[in-house]
Amino acid sequence: MTAVPGFPGAVGLSGLEVYPWPTADDEHGGSPHMHLACAECYVVVSGRGRLETLDHKGPRTTELHPGDVVWFTPGTIHRAINDEDLRVIVVMQNSGLPEAGDAVMTFPPEYLSPETYPDAASLLGADGNPSPERAQARRDLAVAGFTELKRQWRRGNRSAYEDFCAAAVRLVQPRLDTWEKTVNAGALAAAHTALRHIGALRHDDFTHLFEADVSRIAQPPRQTLGMCGFLRAYVEEGGTR
């Protein structure tokens, strides 16, 4: 097996089966959370559901049906709701950033400090392994915080959303140097490569075309516990060329 090039545009790709677990607000789905530097896109493969969001313009619900493409930008608190066997392909900007902490769940304020957030967000059970019970527990905590944020918004208190954003920024600030390196090595490098190719073509230099190749990654065999559901993350190390 040979390492393959990164995905086009340095995006991340995952197959997502949205959690079927019931929530306290009579829905089924995962943990509401927000990305601070990455846009995210859902390509709906099968099933039926909704994307519930809250941003600086207020709460919104977007239907999810097979064939739909829905995307949202940093600052969008979001959760996927599973109405019927919802499966999507997730396209994530800046591959590697969500794994490096660019995702903050909407826990109540007392769990949004650097001291309290890690334990609340942890998936590890008593045996030290990722646990579905822990995934449900942190989901329930995030839903409680999200429900309160929506309630505050509808009461006219816009500052609750802003306070969450400020707390999220404080949580991720120690990681920003790592994020910058990831973007420099990924999306920015990909953009520079494209610009070099364009510059070469202006001078009739098309030698990069002789480096053309085809890569393939099979469906990952193992699922992991994500924020929104069961994930199968496609990683370049698992591909062939």
Task: Label every PLM stretch briefly.
Residues 180-241:
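C-terminal non-catalytic accessory extensions
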Residues 85-157:
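Double-stranded beta-helix
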Residues 126-205:
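An accessory alpha-helical subdomain
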Residues 36-51, 91-95:
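Short, conserved beta-strand element in jelly-roll/cupin
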Residues 2, 15-35:
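Conserved short histidine dyad/triad with adjacent acidic residue
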Residues 27-43, 57-58:
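A short beta-loop-beta micro-motif enriched in histidine and acidic residues
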Residues 64, 76-77, 81-89, 94-108, ...:
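Acidic/histidine-enriched, beta-strand-rich ligand/metal-binding domains
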